[in-house]
Amino acid sequence: MSEFSGVTVVREANIYFNGAVASHTVLFPDGSKKTLGIMQPGEYTFSTGAAELMEILSGELDLQLAGETGWRRIGGGQSFEVPANSSFTMKVQTVSDYCCSFLS
């Protein structure tokens, strides 16, 4: 889905890592939530509360989920899930556009 209808967008941005990662929150009528964002090249570790589905819309990164020893290359058009109460590290290789869905 390339666009969302009938949603509320939170005006204030979510800024991480001194501005290298930024997103905006999108709230849906059914109570679900997504963030749409952009990541500059660099290495970033995030922790999760809820489980997440990360869709990489464009760009390229290397991914390591908590407990994994190796890295996986993820590119535009691919996605990955992160369990609740976990963490993941990304080595972003090129500017990457993403959509993060919070799963219940």
From Swiss-Prot:
Annotated GO MF terms: guanosine phosphorylase activity; purine-nucleoside phosphorylase activity; thymidine phosphorylase activity; uridine phosphorylase activity
Record's keyword terms, sorted: Glycosyltransferase, Transferase
GO terms for cellular component: cytosol
EC number: 2.4.2.1, 2.4.2.2
Database matches in InterPro entries: Ppnp, RmlC-like_jellyroll, RmlC_Cupin_sf
Keyword Ubl conjugation: no
SUPFAM superfamilies in the cross-refs: RmlC-like cupins
Catalytic class of the enzyme: transferase
Catalyzed chemical reaction(s): a purine D-ribonucleoside + phosphate = a purine nucleobase + alpha-D-ribose 1-phosphate; adenosine + phosphate = alpha-D-ribose 1-phosphate + adenine; cytidine + phosphate = cytosine + alpha-D-ribose 1-phosphate; guanosine + phosphate = alpha-D-ribose 1-phosphate + guanine
Protein purpose: Catalyzes the phosphorolysis of diverse nucleosides, yielding D-ribose 1-phosphate and the respective free bases. Can use uridine, adenosine, guanosine, cytidine, thymidine, inosine and xanthosine as substrates. Also catalyzes the reverse reactions.
Similarity remark: Belongs to the nucleoside phosphorylase PpnP family.
Protein name, as recorded: Pyrimidine/purine nucleoside phosphorylase
